[in-house]
Amino acid sequence: LMEKVEKACLALTEKGLPHPTSFEVETAAAFLYFKEENCDVVLLETGMGGREDATNLITHPLCSVITSISMDHMQFLGNTLSEIASAKAGIIKENCPVVSSWQEDVVTEVLVKEAERLRAQLYQPKKDAIRDLLYDMNGMQFDYVSEDNSQWKIKLPLTGAYQAANAACAL
């Protein structure tokens, strides 16, 4: 597998193009693996996320998910939350549902505009979807309340409020 990817990298450099980054090489290897294994469904996580991410060549995903956007990767994505949100909104595809975690208002505005522009249905968990969050040595548990007010008790072997928020996106 890696020999094929290495050969493709060499072909690029022989044409005077820059060698792909480590992440781009790993992403190419993953895509090749998925193809060779005839995967029906792939849950693919972006690197930094966004328009320029190596994973963003999937043109018709089943769904896109955007977790919490904050002031990270600023040298690549922008210097304000709005700029970073705009870059990360690049994974939203036309007529493809997108799920977003709770965001700062400025971020939500950017995501809503991009989703509307691309006719992509935007879903966000209710602000109060996570209730009674408790931590222990085994992780955490919380009650999740859906849009229709169905309630589930969720246990995760992870800790951190952001993990609960990510779980809410998945649910």
What is each stretch, according to the model?
Residues 101, 160-163:
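Hydrophobic alpha-helical scaffolding
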Residues 23-26, 87, 165:
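A generic structural signal for residues located within well-ordered alpha-helices
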